[in-house]
A protein has these predicted regions:
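Residue-level preference for nonpolar/small residues embedded in alpha-helices
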Residues: 38, 59, 121-122, 181
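Hydrophobic anchor at the start of a short beta-strand
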Residues: 53, 137, 196
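Short, ordered loop/turn segments at secondary-structure junctions
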Residues: 58-59, 80, 142, 202
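Charged catalytic cores and adjacent phosphate/nucleic-acid-binding surfaces used
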Residues: 1-32, 36-44, 49, 64-77, ...
Length: 304
């Protein structure tokens, strides 16, 4: 059964949310990978909004380490790694020192030629290595239109069934995704019974806070990450407008074509993906939910 209050597809009212909750944009990029802004600008914007921030650069941690030095901003150390299959995974750390060790021992030796390239580690191996540390592991944008989400053709149904229990949750709203993809991500998150997160996936500070994760907990890194694991978090946000999406995705697509054109070509054929699961019950739940959306299209599907 879907909880009608844990995911809201609407613009976050940040001034109200921060009164009684810890609010964090859990997916943001700096100029150290494919983002536009400096960490200083990111920290200033997060402070002005009154929210926490996770700088989750692609295969890179300098942004996460730098923002950890801003004592007036709640930051969640993290990295968005790219597996051998070209699929992304978000790894959040309770301690910045652990992120630095993980990066040195388990990322740098397996890097590709470019920072945005795939590493040489398969998804399962990345997760196993991340589990050596105190972490929260999340699948971002599972239904991303090209290939960077876990619901892509490189992962068979059987393989996904083995991988899903290995992680802590799913990113259910990503401001750079299409609405249909986010709806499917939300359904996947609920049906897996995992923790849920959301983030802007921002590459410019104007995107920060468009999607946030929040919890009624102490304003601390540990309390917030614990809330994700305990499935106490909620997510609110909307997709960015089409013009901004095209601009942002254009940069990403050029980078992706350069680094792994074979994956792009194969996965463009996979743009209309569906949730695959051995569980008949999960399949039926998803079908009913999606059919309900089509029947009620005259009413905006704002809350799941």
């Amino acid at each position: 059964m879907i909880d009608n209050h844990r995911i809201q597809f609407e613009r976050p009212n940040l001034p109200e949310l921060i009164k009684e909750n810890t609010v964090v944009d859990l997916h943001f990029h700096s100029h150290y990978s494919d983002g536009f802004n400096t960490v200083e600008a990111i920290a200033r914007k997060a402070h002005d909004l009154g929210i926490g921030i996770a700088v989750t650069d692609h295969n890179e941690i300098r942004g996460a380490v730098e923002i950890d030095g801003y004592s007036d901003v709640l930051s969640i150390p993290g990295i968005e790694m790219t597996s051998k299959e070209g699929t992304h995974i978000l790894i959040y750390f309770y301690h910045i020192e652990n992120l630095e060790v993980f990066y040195k021992d388990h990322v740098i030796p397996y890097m590709g030629n470019e920072i945005m390239s795939s590493t040489t580690l398969e998804m399962e191996e990345i997760i196993k290595r991340a589990r050596k540390f105190k972490t929260v592991i999340i699948f971002p944008h599972p239904f991303c239109g090209i290939y960077t989400g876990i619901q892509n053709s490189y992962f068979s149904e059987d393989r996904r069934e083995r991988i899903f229990p290995m992680v802590d949750g799913v990113e259910v709203i990503n401001s750079e995704n299409m609405n249909k993809s986010n709806l499917r991500s939300a359904l996947l998150g609920f049906n897996l019974g995992k923790g849920i997160t959301g983030g802007s996936d921002g590459h410019r500070i104007s995107q920060m806070g468009k999607v946030v994760t929040y919890a009624t907990c102490k304003r601390s890194r540990k309390a917030f990450l614990d809330a994700i694991k305990k499935k106490k978090t909620k997510v609110v946000g909307k997709e960015i407008d089409l013009i901004r999406k095209v601009t942002s995705n254009g940069v990403k697509l050029r980078t992706n074509l350069k680094n792994y054109p074979d994956l792009v070509e194969k996965n463009l054929k996979y743009s209309y993906t569906v949730i695959n699961s051995k569980s008949k019950e999960i399949k039926e739940n998803v079908k009913r939910s999606l059919n309900g959306k089509k029947r009620g299209r005259q009413k905006k599907y704002r809350v799941l």
